Each structure stands twice: as structure tokens, then as C-alpha cells.
């Protein structure tokens, strides 16, 4: 039973690529008035009076301005025009913003509109993701909830990379659902591509989708009667998805690894100028242990000084691990500033993210008003889906449930106990 059986809507043909003409595409979209409503609400909330946010996060804005005028800085995600140091994140979000600024000039709309559009796309994808399995009314509700969640609206009007990660995560889930429905390898590959692009946006955070996705894939496809050899086909499909993730997600890190240190900026957030330290340390375990500072906030300052918005842990830490590019003999050009590249690159106000760790952290004053208030509804929806699917194997609805609920658990645990 779907929500459409309770609140019926006119039956129309599903969206698809059969007729690629613009007029046909518009007619198909017009046949889904609820989708138009979702996109309209998202567009209004994300784009209205966007210029009021100015340059938003000035650290990323400065980096984008540098990247917009230099292809070298663009390629290596440099935070400054001199190509001295990279941003402390992968480049995908900055690349999109820099291309926009290169085309339209440096202004609030050119800087922030890409994220606003990503928020609109996310809402549309969420609508179709839920509609495919549970009907148009449910899809409309899902799209509206996503595009009106306060923290989603805020990030859609900001130049932090979070909104791109949201869009890619929803896109990965959409592709994964298509894989569950069709059992075709190409959709697993596309799932891997989307998660890989998410890795190029915020590194390890994007990988939190993987445990639940693999469990859902195995639950729907595992057939005990076939034995190990008989189950190799679906496992091989998962491996193809993993290969796509690795190729896409590691493309830029491998470029940084293979480029001589003298020919590229210093890798921010590291003591040894290693991209792998950035992945595993600053943007990996450091985010869990609290060694990397909190997310968000303003640009960090040099010499251990607090940056705009009270930057947390430093760009890096001590620079004794090697010479900065352009300075010979291990010279540290910032030795007069305490020998440190301080203030978190875009670091948050304090080193503790969202208050004290614990089971109820997502419901505290800092996080509850942003998205924590949705957790109760999410739990009710999961219980309803369990009753609806009865966890039947071979049922895409069951796979959808495991993927969504499992991701909620993984993300909830990580953000509840990360320091």
C-alpha cells in the first residue's frame, strides 16, 4: 500500500529520457504539479535575497577568487593567489564556485548561486527517490521536508561544501535504488561515481553511506541456496561500484601525490605535506577525535591566532615536517608567528562540535533546532516501512529501508560521539 492509495493523484507517465526535446521535457514536468511545488519552494528559500550573505565563508571565498584567475591554483585547490597552500578540503565544491565566478565575475550570486541550485536539485531528487517506491504524495512530503529543513536552507545559501555533499548523497541513494530495482551493474557504477564525487567534496564523510548500502545490497540479493559461487554475481556488481568510487574519489588525491612538492601548494591541515595525511588525519580520524577542529566558521588566522569566527585547530600544526613550497632548506616563512600555521582552515568556533558527546547530542540546543527535531518522524517512518515491507528479501522496498535506516544509524552514531 502506498500513500497514493489514500490520497490519489492523477496517473501520468514516469519521467524518462525517451524524448529528449525541451518541449517534451517541460510537458512531463508539468504533469507532476507537486514536483513543481517542491522546486518552487526550494528555489524561493535558496535564492531569495541571496546577496545578503555577502561572501559567506570568507576563507572559501578568497580561495575561489584565487582559483578563478589562475588555472594552476584551480587545479591544486590553492587558497591564495601565490599558490602557497591548499584549502583544507578536496576541490570539487571550490571548482564549481570558481567556474561560476570566472564566468559571471566575483559577486555574491556567482559565489553562492551554485549551492542554491544544488539545494533545488537535491529536493527534486529526493521527491523522485521516494516517489518511485511509495508514491507521489510521499515524494512530495519528502521533498518539502528536505528543502525546508533550516540547516539545509542555510547551507544552500552558503559557500561551504556541505550542500554539494548533500546533493551527491541523495543522488547516490537515487542511483542505488535504481540498482535495487533493475539489478543492473551500471547503476551500481553510478552509485560509486556519486559517492566518489562526494569524497572529492568532503573526503571520508561521504563514505558513511557505504555500510548501509552494502548491507541492503546483500540482503536483497543473497540467496543461501546458491552457495558462495552462486552469489558471486551480485558481489561482483558491488565490486564494480567500489572500483568506480575509487577511481573517481582518488583522482585528485593521486594527482597531488604524484606532483612534486615544489610544483604545488603545501597541503593544508598536514605536518608532512602529504595528501594521505589530510585524508586519514585532518579530514579523517581527526574529525572523530576532535584534533581537526569543528566544521564551519570563518577563515583561520596565521600564527595560531584565531581566524574569523574563531577558527579551531590549525591549518596544519607544526611545519617541521618539511619545507613549504617556494622556501628552501626547510625554512618556515611563518616562524615569526610562533612557527605554526594556525587557526583552522574554515574551522568552527570551538573544538567541540555541537556540544558534549552522548546519545542525545543530536537533540541538544545546538543541533536539535537544525535537524534533530526530524529524528522522531524518521523513527516513525522507519517503523512504518518495517511493517510495510516485513523485511522481505528480493524486495527493493526492503533494500531502500535498510539503506536509509542504516545510513541514519551510522551518521547518528558518528555525529553523536565525534569529539
Regions found by a protein language model. Give the residues of each.
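Membrane-integral, polyisoprenol-dependent glycosyltransferases
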Residues: 1-292, 302-419
Amino acid at each position: 500500500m502506498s500513500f497514493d492509495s489514500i490520497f490519489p493523484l492523477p496517473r501520468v507517465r514516469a519521467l524518462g529520457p525517451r524524448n529528449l526535446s525541451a518541449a517534451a521535457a517541460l510537458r512531463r514536468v508539468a504533469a507532476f504539479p507537486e514536483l513543481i511545488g517542491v522546486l518552487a519552494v526550494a528555489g524561493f528559500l535558496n535564492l531569495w535575497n541571496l546577496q545578503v550573505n555577502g561572501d559567506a565563508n570568507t576563507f572559501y571565498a578568497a580561495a575561489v577568487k584565487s582559483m578563478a584567475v589562475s588555472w594552476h591554483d584551480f587545479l591544486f585547490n590553492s587558497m591564495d593567489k601565490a599558490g602557497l597552500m591548499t584549502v583544507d578540503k578536496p576541490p570539487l565544491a571550490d571548482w564549481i564556485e570558481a567556474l561560476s565566478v570566472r564566468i559571471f565575475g566575483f559577486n555574491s550570486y556567482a559565489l553562492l548561486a551554485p549551492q542554491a541550485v544544488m539545494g533545488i536539485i537535491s529536493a527534486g531528487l529526493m521527491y523522485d527517490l521516494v516517489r518511485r517506491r511509495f508514491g507521489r504524495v510521499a515524494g512530495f512530503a519528502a521533498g518539502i521536508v528536505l528543502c525546508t529543513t533550516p540547516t539545509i536552507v542555510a547551507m544552500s545559501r552558503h559557500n561551504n561544501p556541505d550542500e554539494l555533499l548533500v546533493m551527491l548523497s541523495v543522488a547516490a541513494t537515487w542511483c542505488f535504488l535504481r540498482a535495487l530495482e533493475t539489478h543492473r551493474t551500471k547503476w551500481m557504477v553510478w552509485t560509486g561515481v556519486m559517492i566518489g564525487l562526494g569524497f572529492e567534496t568532503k573526503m571520508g564523510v561521504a563514505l558513511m553511506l557505504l555500510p548501509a548500502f552494502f548491507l541492503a545490497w546483500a540482503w536483497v540479493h543473497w540467496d543461501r541456496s546458491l552457495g558462495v559461487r552462486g552469489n558471486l554475481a551480485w558481489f561482483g556488481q558491488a565490486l564494480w561500484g567500489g572500483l568506480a568510487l575509487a577511481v573517481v574519489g582518488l583522482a585528485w588525491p593521486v594527482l597531488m601525490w604524484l606532483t612534486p612538492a615544489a610544483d604545488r601548494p603545501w597541503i593544508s591541515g598536514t605536518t608532512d605535506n602529504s595528501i594521505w595525511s589530510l585524508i586519514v588525519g585532518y579530514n579523517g580520524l581527526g574529525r572523530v577525535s576532535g584534533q581537526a577542529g569543528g566544521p564551519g566558521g570563518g577563515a583561520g588566522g596565521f600564527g595560531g591566532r584565531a581566524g574569523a569566527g574563531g577558527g579551531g585547530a590549525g591549518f596544519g600544526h607544526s611545519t617541521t615536517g618539511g619545507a613549504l613550497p617556494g622556501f628552501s632548506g626547510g625554512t618556515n616563512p611563518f616562524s615569526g608567528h610562533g612557527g605554526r600555521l594556525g587557526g583552522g582552515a574554515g574551522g568552527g568556533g570551538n573544538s567541540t562540535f555541537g556540544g558534549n558527546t552522548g546519545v542525545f547530542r543530536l537533540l541538544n540546543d545546538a543541533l536539535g533546532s537544525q535537524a534533530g527535531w526530524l529524528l522522531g518522524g524518521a523513527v516513525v517512518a522507519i517503523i512504518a516501512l518495517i511493517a510495510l515491507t516485513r523485511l522481505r528479501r528480493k524486495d527493493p522496498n526492503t533494500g531502500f529501508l535498510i539503506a536509509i535506516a542504516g545510513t541514519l544509524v551510522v551518521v547518528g552514531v558518528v555525529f553523536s560521539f565525534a569529539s
